[in-house]
Amino acid sequence: MGRKKIQISRILDQRNRQVTFTKRKFGLMKKAYELSVLCDCDIALIIFNSAQRLFQYASSDMDRVLLKYTEYSEPHESRTNADILQTLKRRGVGLDGPELDMEEGPEGPGEKLLRTLGGDRGSASPRPRIYPVAPAMSVSELSYRVPPATPGCDPGGLGEVPSVHSRPAYFRPPGLGHPIFSPSHLASKTPPPLYLATDGRRPDLPPGLVGARGGLGTSRSLYSGLQSPGAPGPALGSFAFLPSGSTDCSPGDAAQGPLQPSPWPPTRDAVDPARPVARSLCKEGPPSRGASPPTPPVSIKSERLSPVTGTSGDFPRSFPYPLLLARPLAEPLRPSASLHRLTPDSWPR
């Protein structure tokens, strides 16, 4: 329960007046003690009651404080009951209101209202919530996200190299997919011969391209088995495509299987013969400048090479266009005129 409000006027009852004097006198001395300790000041209280009895309080020594008082001659603050009443009226508090702690400087009713509202608003108003902002995604991440490529050959995976305008698939389980091209494409497209030096021998490859050379040997045996239409051979779709920079492809990674017709409709490559289709079996990174020209991956071009008179007898007549040379690997290959027809524009990039 709060303190009972009383009217600030002379108490007529003698007993009540005596009790109130005793309590408030001690309260006044207690406040003087707190002020002297907290603010390091000298305080002297001199009180005479209605019966003219003296009550005094001094923070240190009354005589010393009174001596300082009599010797002090500078202007100082001096208050009376009239000054206190005027200050209370200016603050909007009557004499019958609750006790008010006197603060430094006068405070009007508007200032007190703002201070009260500010204290209530600071304790009751909730703090503004700050929500974390998601990091902005780049345009490439918004369009699609490509999972990281797994290094090494995947014997059961089938697929083809995506073009620039195609969207890569999110996930392709191993063993499922589509063949590289249908049998109808084999009859209409001719693979370009492997890159050979002018003297008819294979060029010396850098140490980083040894794995790709082994992959090309695998493609030789692959195409030699597909010379005749009736002879079965390893399926072209059994060779999975490697990510750039991987050299783990070897002849033992190829799986055996027949060619399957493609369930997809013919792409734009079958309609437009002037657009090359770049499909690689083992792909290496871009060659460094100043090094010898690397061996290009085996690819299928839509451009038909003109028949060469010197090499027409090396292939059977049953198949219209040769896929690869049928001679064994130990026998040196003869340079043909088709090597001079390869231009840098036809190399896959």
UniProtKB/Swiss-Prot annotation:
Subunit structure comment from the entry: Heterodimer. Interacts with HDAC9. Interacts with HDAC7.
GO MF annotation list: DNA-binding transcription activator activity, RNA polymerase II-specific; DNA-binding transcription factor activity; histone deacetylase binding; protein dimerization activity; RNA polymerase II cis-regulatory region sequence-specific DNA binding
Lineage: Eukaryota, Metazoa, Chordata, Craniata, Vertebrata
DNA-binding region range list: 58-86
Family, similarity comment: Belongs to the MEF2 family.
Gene3D superfamilies on file: Transcription factor, MADS-box
A GO CC term attached to the entry: nucleus
PANTHER family: MADS BOX PROTEIN, MYOCYTE-SPECIFIC ENHANCER FACTOR 2B
This protein's record includes keyword Glycoprotein: no
Subcellular location: Nucleus
Annotated protein name in UniProt: Myocyte-specific enhancer factor 2B
Tissue expr: Highest expression found in embryonic heart and skeletal muscle. Low levels found in adult spleen, lung and testis while no expression is found in adult heart, brain or skeletal muscle.
InterPro entries: MEF2-like_N, TF_MADSbox, TF_MADSbox_sf
Record organism: Mus musculus (Mouse)
One Pfam family named in its UniProt record: SRF-TF
Major site of localization recorded for this protein: nucleus
Region feature Disordered, mapped onto this chain: 237-317, 330-349
Keywords from the named record: Activator, DNA-binding, Nucleus, Transcription, Transcription regulation
Role summary: Transcriptional activator which binds specifically to the MEF2 element, 5'-YTA[AT](4)TAR-3', found in numerous muscle-specific genes. Activates transcription via this element. May be involved in muscle-specific and/or growth factor-related transcription.
